[in-house]
Amino acid sequence: MGGISIWQLLIIALIVVLLFGTKKLRSLGGDLGGAVKGFKNAMSSEEDKKALEDAEAAKPVQTAQTAQPTQQATEKKPESNKEQA
């Protein structure tokens, strides 16, 4: 009671085939399958893109090394004897 039996489903399927024809149903099925395949490809490419972004974010960021000031070597002039005398 209240449920759909197998006979009712077969009658509905027969009416649909008579209304649309087998060629139209076959093309609709192919279109539907292509849409589902495209949706799955888009979802997997988004997941791959997200995983790639996460991997790039996990990499340590290389910072520019600051240049340390270097002391120039200057030769110390020998003191002349004038100052000592």
Swiss-Prot record:
The keyword Transport applies. The chain crosses the membrane at residues 1-21. One of its GO terms (cellular component) is TAT protein transport complex. Pfam families: TatA_B_E (PF02416). The keyword NAD does not apply. InterPro entries: TatA/B/E, TatA/E. Residues 43-85 are annotated as: Disordered. It is a single-pass membrane protein. Residues 46-57, 74-85 have a biased composition (Basic and acidic residues). Keywords: Cell inner membrane, Cell membrane, Membrane, Protein transport, Translocation, Transmembrane, Transmembrane helix, Transport. GO terms for biological process: protein transport by the Tat complex. Residues 58-73 have a biased composition (Low complexity). It is found in: Cell inner membrane. GO terms for molecular function: protein transmembrane transporter activity. NCBIfam families: PRK02958.1, tatAE. Part of the twin-arginine translocation (Tat) system that transports large folded proteins containing a characteristic twin-arginine motif in their signal peptide across membranes. TatA could form the protein-conducting channel of the Tat system. Belongs to the TatA/E family. The Tat system comprises two distinct complexes: a TatABC complex, containing multiple copies of TatA, TatB and TatC subunits, and a separate TatA complex, containing only TatA subunits. Substrates initially bind to the TatABC complex, which probably triggers association of the separate TatA complex to form the active translocon. This is Sec-independent protein translocase protein TatA. It comes from Shewanella sp. (strain MR-4). The gene is tatA.
